[in-house]
Amino acid sequence: MKRIGVLTSGGDSPGMNAAIRAVVRKAIYHGVEVYGIYQGYAGLISGDIRKMELGSVGDIIHRGGTILYTARCEEFKTLEGQKKGIEQLKKFGIEGLVVIGGDGSFAGAQKLTEHGFPTVGVPGTIDNDIPGTDFTIGFDTALNTVIDAIDKIRDTATSHDRTYVIEVMGRNAGDLALWSGLADGAETIVIPEADHDIDQIISRLQRGQERGKKHSIIVVAEGVGSGMDFGREISERTGAETRVTVLGHIQRGGSPTGFDRVLASRLGAKAVDLLLEGQAGVTVGIENNKLVHHDITEVLQRKHSIDLDMYRLSQELSI
């Protein structure tokens, strides 16, 4: 293999640039040319493809976002769109592709594999919802962003004797809510993977009020429901002054943490190794601090699981 491509797709996550850097540098180290595909699968279809050199990835390891830009592309979900993408890859002489992104990005990579084109997926999403890896690129940075925000919100909550409902990202996964809630001592954590009873949540808050507790923090994953709705019901049923904060896209931005930079570097370099070894249709990951790879179809078919022991611990500590 003498020429490979790399693209980022779907929602951006801090550390994607570090992964791009690792792909480019590892490939060039092995004498392989690298082409960057801009705007994800949309850029693949349109042919927005440019050769990358060592200088192309200079001074980006610390930057959030992605220098290749990203986009969601409905056209690539069609057979015609996939054929256009493969035609562009052949036109540029690209023999293998590294795809950095989440499950939607991996679904696109799987389609390329089915058409006989070698791909390797690198998990990049703040949701940490990709099976086959303990952590995804960007999760640790987003977690620290959320923790910092909750720390600041708790300061004002204690000053005004208020209950705060904080909605964090996590459409189908509660990792951000669980980890940040546990780290910040939240009184209640609401995630998609665990049943929640609003009556029990209200009772817990009322017990706290009865023993003199003046403020509370409730962390809600967006996939469970609207933080605004939670806040409204809590205010109506407890009489507590309640405020709602939706953290939104601030969770995706910022300079990646050291952990995410190292993780992205390891996964990006491993993706190149796998392509050069002749592997195709796989994803890279890290399990027990060891680099691993799994069949991409298997990864897409598996359901994300959360550490329910950690969830139970959060409940035990928030009595």
From Swiss-Prot:
Localization annotation: Cytoplasm
Cofactors that this protein relies on: Mg(2+)
Keywords carried by this UniProt record: Allosteric enzyme, ATP-binding, Cytoplasm, Glycolysis, Kinase, Magnesium, Metal-binding, Nucleotide-binding, Transferase
Residues at which Mg(2+) binds: 103
Matching InterPro entries: ATP_PFK, ATP_PFK_prok-type, PFKA_ATP_prok, Phosphofructokinase_CS, Phosphofructokinase_dom, PKF_sf
Catalytic activity line of the entry: beta-D-fructose 6-phosphate + ATP = beta-D-fructose 1,6-bisphosphate + ADP + H(+)
Pathway involvement of the protein, from the record: Carbohydrate degradation; glycolysis; D-glyceraldehyde 3-phosphate and glycerone phosphate from D-glucose: step 3/4
Residues binding ATP: 11, 72-73, 102-105
GO BP annotations listed: canonical glycolysis; fructose 1,6-bisphosphate metabolic process; fructose 6-phosphate metabolic process
Name of the top EC class for this enzyme: transferase
Cytoplasm among keywords: yes
NCBIfam families recorded: PFKA_ATP, PRK03202.1
SUBUNIT field: Homotetramer.
Protein name as catalogued: ATP-dependent 6-phosphofructokinase
Source organism: Halalkalibacterium halodurans (strain ATCC BAA-125 / DSM 18197 / FERM 7344 / JCM 9153 / C-125) (Bacillus halodurans)
